[in-house]
């Protein structure tokens, strides 16, 4: 069994990379792949780069070249639920694009033509994530909808627009739906794990810079426990 872990930025992958044993590095199309053993499992860690195009391209390379059995996306996000705080963690049950609009042709808002309106995370991976989340102290962990777009959510008007389209939205970020779409095309199970570095629209650029490392650690800690559970 091989487990792939994807993070967009150095801050989101460095904790995991440092723990990989027998590590080998490969660069393909400027995407950084690290293979080896993590908590007893065979893993491929990918630093994808930021944004949907980078995420889709690198995920396609990952799935075609390395053939993982599972994909876990880790990293930071902006929170949308009023009950969530910086550092809290969101586990995806579904993922959607928040910047796709082909409603003029009868599609749902966020739906890419020919694709499902939302991408469903693997139920087994979600359950494993939820079980391991029970061991986490001092932060909230919720399961829900994550939305993706090629913009950082610091514009209050944009935040309110996205919230109006997806009232149940838990978090927004810049890669997950692209990763989910590619995994769906390849029929590879996935789950998204995101810790909040900011609350969307509330001085989010300042919060992001201040709390990115904390968010990355919280997300990585849960990913490590998921990897261990999958290996059992």
Swiss-Prot record:
GO terms for molecular function: adenosylhomocysteine nucleosidase activity; methylthioadenosine nucleosidase activity. Pfam families: PNP_UDP_1. Signal peptide: none annotated. Substrate binds at residues 78, 153, 174-175. One of its GO terms (cellular component) is cytosol. Pathway: Amino-acid biosynthesis; L-methionine biosynthesis via salvage pathway; S-methyl-5-thio-alpha-D-ribose 1-phosphate from S-methyl-5'-thioadenosine (hydrolase route): step 1/2. The keyword Hydrolase applies. Belongs to the PNP/UDP phosphorylase family. MtnN subfamily. One of its GO terms (biological process) is L-methionine salvage from S-adenosylmethionine. The keyword Cell division does not apply. Its EC number is 3.2.2.9. Keywords: Amino-acid biosynthesis, Hydrolase, Methionine biosynthesis. InterPro entries: MTA_SAH_Nsdase (IPR010049), Nucleoside_phosphorylase_d (IPR000845), Nucleoside_phosphorylase_sf (IPR035994). Catalyzes the irreversible cleavage of the glycosidic bond in both 5'-methylthioadenosine (MTA) and S-adenosylhomocysteine (SAH/AdoHcy) to adenine and the corresponding thioribose, 5'-methylthioribose and S-ribosylhomocysteine, respectively. Also cleaves 5'-deoxyadenosine, a toxic by-product of radical S-adenosylmethionine (SAM) enzymes, into 5-deoxyribose and adenine. It comes from the Bacteria. The active site is at 12 (proton acceptor), 198 (proton donor). This is 5'-methylthioadenosine/S-adenosylhomocysteine nucleosidase. It catalyses: S-adenosyl-L-homocysteine + H2O = S-(5-deoxy-D-ribos-5-yl)-L-homocysteine + adenine; S-methyl-5'-thioadenosine + H2O = 5-(methylsulfanyl)-D-ribose + adenine; 5'-deoxyadenosine + H2O = 5-deoxy-D-ribose + adenine.
């Amino acid at each position: 069994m091989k487990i792939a872990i994807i993070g967009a930025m150095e801050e989101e992958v460095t904790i995991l990379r440092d723990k990989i044993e027998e590590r080998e590095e490969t660069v393909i199309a400027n995407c950084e792949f690290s293979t080896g053993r993590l908590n007893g499992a065979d893993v491929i860690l990918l630093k994808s780069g930021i944004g949907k195009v980078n995420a889709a391209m690198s995920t396609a390379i990952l799935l075609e070249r390395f053939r993982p059995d599972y994909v876990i996306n880790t990293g930071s996000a902006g929170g949308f639920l009023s009950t969530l705080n910086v550092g809290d963690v969101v586990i995806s049950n579904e993922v959607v694009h928040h910047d796709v609009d082909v409603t003029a042709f009868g599609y749902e808002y966020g739906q890419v033509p020919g694709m499902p309106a939302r991408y469903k995370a693997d139920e087994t991976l979600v359950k494993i994530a939820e079980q391991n989340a029970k061991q986490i102290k001092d932060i909230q962990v919720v399961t829900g909808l994550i939305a993706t777009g090629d913009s950082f959510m610091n514009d209050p008007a944009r935040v309110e627009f996205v919230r109006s389209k997806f009232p149940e939205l838990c978090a927004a970020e810049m890669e997950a739906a692209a990763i989910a779409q590619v995994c769906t095309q390849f029929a590879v199970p996935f789950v998204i794990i995101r810790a909040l570095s900011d609350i969307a629209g509330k001085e989010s650029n300042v919060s992001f810079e201040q709390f990115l490392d904390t968010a990355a650690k919280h997300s990585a800690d849960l990913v490590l426990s998921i990897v261990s559970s999958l290996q059992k």
